[in-house]
């Protein structure tokens, strides 16, 4: 085993991982969103967005309008929610924008999804970003990998095997 070759492979892997991380962080800074790309996980926004669509977010707009599709996070829930702004207003005391949302495919608004005793989302605190573009169905790959433990193990095995067999 050539130590220099193995060290070069390891450093190339570290460089690739660091580059991907820097790209993600750079995109986060440009979009002002800690998660600038998300995958739709449910059918609550059909027909506008299907399960598996990849959404690109932007969070530099000052105010959201009724009809905007936003991604928001709720306290104590890990998965962000993609829904449309149903109603908006500015709180007179704080000057902050408050939003009420609803999934296009849902019967009622999202108040039951919000934290206890909360009837509006705070733009600055709860909104991850506004949807500015999407790629249909490409996110199914991530859904399939996350929901299928054998797919995870197979992918990890494939990565390990390719690292072991590479002759560069």
UniProtKB/Swiss-Prot annotation:
Known catalytic reactions: Cleavage of hydrophobic, N-terminal signal or leader sequences from secreted and periplasmic proteins
Keyword tags: Endoplasmic reticulum, Hydrolase, Membrane, Protease, Signal-anchor, Transmembrane, Transmembrane helix
EC class (word): hydrolase
Stretch list, region C-terminal short (CTS) helix: 154-165
Origin superkingdom: Eukaryota
One GO location term (cellular component): signal peptidase complex
Main localization, broad class: endoplasmic reticulum
Annotated catalytic residues: 44 (charge relay system), 83 (charge relay system), 110 (charge relay system)
Family matches, as InterPro entries: LexA/Signal_pep-like_sf, Pept_S26A_signal_pept_1_Ser-AS, Peptidase_S26B
Membrane-spanning ranges: 13-30
Bilayer topology term: Single-pass type II membrane protein
Any one GO molecular-function label of the UniProt entry: serine-type endopeptidase activity
UniProt topological domain (Lumenal) ranges: 31-168
Keyword Manganese attributed: no
GO biological process: signal peptide processing
Its EC number(s): 3.4.21.89
Keyword Protease: yes
Location of this chain's protein in the cell: Endoplasmic reticulum membrane
PROSITE patterns per record: SPASE_I_1
Chain ranges on the Cytoplasmic side, renumbered to this chain: 1-12
Complex formation: Component of the signal peptidase complex (SPC) composed of a catalytic subunit SEC11 and three accessory subunits SPC1, SPC2 and SPC3. The complex induces a local thinning of the ER membrane which is used to measure the length of the signal peptide (SP) h-region of protein substrates. This ensures the selectivity of the complex towards h-regions shorter than 18-20 amino acids. SPC associates with the translocon complex.
NCBIfam families with a match to the protein in the record: sigpep_I_arch
Domain remarks in the Swiss-Prot or TrEMBL record: The C-terminal short (CTS) helix is essential for catalytic activity. It may be accommodated as a transmembrane helix in the thinned membrane environment of the complex, similarly to the signal peptide in the complex substrates.
Family: Belongs to the peptidase S26B family.
Function: Catalytic component of the signal peptidase complex (SPC) which catalyzes the cleavage of N-terminal signal sequences from nascent proteins as they are translocated into the lumen of the endoplasmic reticulum. Specifically cleaves N-terminal signal peptides that contain a hydrophobic alpha-helix (h-region) shorter than 18-20 amino acids.
Full protein name: Signal peptidase complex catalytic subunit SEC11
Gene that this sequence comes from: SEC11
